[in-house]
């Protein structure tokens, strides 16, 4: 029985790894400003740690519970979303350029020119 259970666990683990790999492949990198605007300008970005909204005029606003509201500017540069916000750590280091990836109504941002921490947000129409 142990042998059968071990085989089942191995098969389950293999399936989970394959499913995870397939899910990771579903993310598509956003490489143009036009694609970024079509996807992420207008909707509210809902992160587990707060919200953000990017506007067509190059401004952005957001809110992080415990820290408050923030605002700033953004531009598309070198296939990345670059933002400068007047809010704690970002302001201390200036621009933060992020790689943007999309999967359905979700986006994944990776900070520090794609070398930093990644966060996932759900895009929802503004109420």
Model-predicted regions and their roles:
Residues 7, 19-127:
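Lipid interaction determinants
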Residues 1-10:
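Bacterial N-terminal signal peptides that target proteins for export
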């Amino acid at each position: 029985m142990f042998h059968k259970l071990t085989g089942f666990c191995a098969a389950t683990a293999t399936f989970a790894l394959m499913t995870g790999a397939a899910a990771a492949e579903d993310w598509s990198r956003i490489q143009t400003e036009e694609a970024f605007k079509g996807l992420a300008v207008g909707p509210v970005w809902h992160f587990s740690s707060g919200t953000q909204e990017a506007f067509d005029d190059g401004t952005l606003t957001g809110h992080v519970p415990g820290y408050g509201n923030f605002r700033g500017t953004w531009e598309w540069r070198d296939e990345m979303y670059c933002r400068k916000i007047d809010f704690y750590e970002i302001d201390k280091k200036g621009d933060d350029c992020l790689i943007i990836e999309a999967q359905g109504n979700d986006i994944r941002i990776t900070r520090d020119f794609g070398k930093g921490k990644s966060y996932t947000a759900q895009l929802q129409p503004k109420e």
